[in-house]
């Protein structure tokens, strides 16, 4: 009796006659059907970009997973099974909609941040479960090293990475980043990144929250070993443009280092969800105050008007504005499937140059909130 085989065609696969991507997909499909496996929704190479000067290609938008398992800043200080299921939905929906780049860190939801469950552990579990369902599934993972004062030397970086790999249930990650510059010993940390590359533990390396000078120093130190600095992950959004004002964005563009933008929708402030009458809860409420949200309304109103022309949400407009800056990969944080699907709809189309300029002009009238202090060191 013939065995019935189930497979799912890719959600966003672009078929072009004679293309390498089409041939590759067909070969994978034939192998999967022959083996009885399900086929993961494919992500076309056209939807990916190279990360800096590395050989690593990732999707033009990623997903930040800081909130997964966290109870020190997000989730109203509580983590439960309902939020766990929602996070799993965010992961699967991201992949189903063409986003395969996930950014985590060893301090997210871990003992360092007093979280209940490690974000790395959850991401590793979700990847394992995805591959059990779709053996050929591919996921790009970025994680980070915490430059804690008691960590010294290059060995601390490799040791921390191996611990992260254990939590992620992986033998290597795609991108390993220094989460912030240390109080001392940064040369050793950079040497540790190089060692991790040479040991095959990571495909590409980057930094996070690095100023222009620190970025240039890191770039040159790694360059001496023939290793490209792939990325600098910083706080960057329509209403927080410090990377432009401090020279970080220009330096990234000059050196060919990809700028990965965290808080690209200003922790929800640019979604239109929050108003002076309904500010965010928890620590965010002390950052995005009623006074700030009042000043933000004219910009949000215009974002909504522009969004109506494209049938896009304010969130999608804000993210697309960042992509329009060039050499930028936004990584909004997704807590559930609905958010993940919305984020995926932020790419694959473009605002006009006039709209990009108009939004910048309106945003310039708003005094930005305080960022991460090390950005200016």
Curated annotation (Swiss-Prot):
Sites where the protein binds NADP(+): 263-273
Keyword Translocase on entry: no
Subcellular location: Plastid, Chloroplast, Plastoglobule
Keywords, comma-separated and alphabetical: Acetylation, Chloroplast, NADP, Oxidoreductase, Plastid, Transit peptide
Enzyme's top EC category: oxidoreductase
One GO molecular-function entry: oxidoreductase activity
N-acetylalanine carried by residues: 32
Coiled coil: none
InterPro entries on file: AKR, Aldo-Keto_reductase, Aldo/ket_reductase_CS, NADP_OxRdtase_dom, NADP_OxRdtase_dom_sf
Pfam families: Aldo_ket_red
A cellular component term, taken from the record's GO annotations: plastoglobule
Transit peptide (residue range): 1-31
Active-site residues, record numbering mapped to chain: 108 (proton donor)
Similarity annotation: Belongs to the aldo/keto reductase family. Aldo/keto reductase 2 subfamily.
Official protein name in the record: Uncharacterized oxidoreductase At1g06690, chloroplastic
Higher taxonomy: Eukaryota, Viridiplantae, Streptophyta, Embryophyta, Tracheophyta
């Amino acid at each position: 009796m013939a065995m019935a085989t189930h497979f799912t065609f890719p959600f966003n696969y672009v078929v072009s006659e004679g293309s390498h991507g089409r041939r590759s997909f067909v070969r994978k499909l034939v192998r999967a059907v022959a083996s009885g496996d399900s086929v993961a929704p494919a992500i076309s190479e056209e939807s990916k970009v190279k990360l800096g000067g590395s050989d690593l290609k990732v999707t033009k938008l990623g997903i930040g997973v800081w909130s997964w398992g966290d109870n020190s800043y997000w989730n109203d200080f509580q983590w439960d099974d309902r939020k766990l299921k929602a996070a799993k939905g965010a992961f699967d929906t991201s992949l189903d909609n063409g986003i395969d780049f996930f950014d985590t860190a060893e301090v997210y939801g871990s003992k360092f941040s007093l979280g209940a469950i490690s974000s790395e552990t959850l991401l590793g579990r979700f990847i394992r479960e995805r591959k059990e369902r779709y053996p050929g599934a591919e996921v790009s993972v970025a994680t980070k090293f915490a430059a804690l004062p008691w960590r010294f030397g290059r060995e601390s970086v490799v040791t921390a990475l191996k611990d992260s790999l254990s939590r992620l249930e992986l033998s290597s990650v795609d991108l390993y980043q220094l989460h912030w510059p240390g109080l001392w010993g940064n040369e050793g940390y950079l040497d540790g990144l190089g060692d991790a590359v040479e040991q095959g533990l990571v495909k590409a390396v980057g930094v996070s929250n690095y100023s222009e000078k620190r970025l240039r120093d890191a770039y040159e130190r790694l360059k001496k070993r023939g290793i490209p600095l792939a990325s600098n992950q910083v706080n960057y959004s329509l209403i927080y443009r410090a990377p432009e004002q401090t020279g970080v964005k220009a330096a990234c563009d000059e050196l060919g280092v990809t700028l990965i933008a965290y808080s690209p929708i200003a922790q929800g402030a640019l979604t239109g969800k929050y108003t002076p009458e309904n500010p965010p809860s928890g620590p965010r409420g002390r950052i995005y105050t009623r006074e700030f949200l009042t000043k933000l309304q004219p910009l949000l109103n215009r974002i909504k008007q522009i969004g109506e022309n494209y049938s896009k949400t304010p969130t999608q407009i804000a993210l697309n504005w960042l992509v329009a800056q060039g050499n930028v990969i936004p990584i909004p944080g997704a807590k559930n499937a609905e958010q993940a699907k919305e984020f995926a709809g932020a790419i694959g189309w473009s605002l006009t140059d006039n709209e990009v300029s108009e939004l910048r002009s309106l945003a310039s009238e708003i005094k930005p909130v305080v960022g991460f202090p090390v950005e200016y060191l």
